[in-house]
Amino acid sequence: KFGFASYSCSSDVDLALEVALKGENGVAVIMGTGLVAFARSGETLHRTGGRGYMIDKGGSGFHFGSDAFNCAFEFIEGRGGSETILKLVEKRFGKSLESSVAEIYDGGASFVASFASVVFEAFMLGDSSACEIIDRNAYEAAKIINGARKSLGNNENRIVICGGLCKQKEILYPFLEKYIDGDFLLEFLDEPIVNGAISLAGRINKC
């Protein structure tokens, strides 16, 4: 149907690199539930980040969602926070946040990450706490991107971001832009990572 032979891919990393870079050099950044960057120059590949939510500090969907919960509880407890974020979180749950704690822990990292969108929705409503959350996470994401580029001597200017947070590219771009070092070309890719398998098979079939 696709006009090429079958191909067995070794890992999701191969697919992400292919769909982001299409066999070219650069930095591929996966911003989904977690966050990891891969810098490639020829046959050299360097990984930065992606150590999991118990180690990494921010920039992932999990951290955006976790920050939303924390911000909401801060408001409940009179420690600052955001009433807007609290209302959006409770709207998603359909009940009070205080009665939803067990559900949060039962849901795990991917469930927490699903609340990342709340932060961006609050930002669009002009919420200052949401702006702070985005800025802080963009800073952490940029540190990982900068580390990946440094591993290759900052010789690769192309940075391609893929994953679920690409849906927020219009908001994320200016926040990331101010923290990424040097000259760069930043792209957000909406294409599903699984398409990397099709692209890889097509290129290999031409060899």
Show where each model-derived region lies.
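Phosphate-binding/catalytic loop of phosphoryl-transfer enzymes
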Residues: K1-E83
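ATP-binding/phosphotransfer module of carbohydrate and carboxylate kinases, centering on a glycine-rich
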Residues: V19-V27, F69-C207
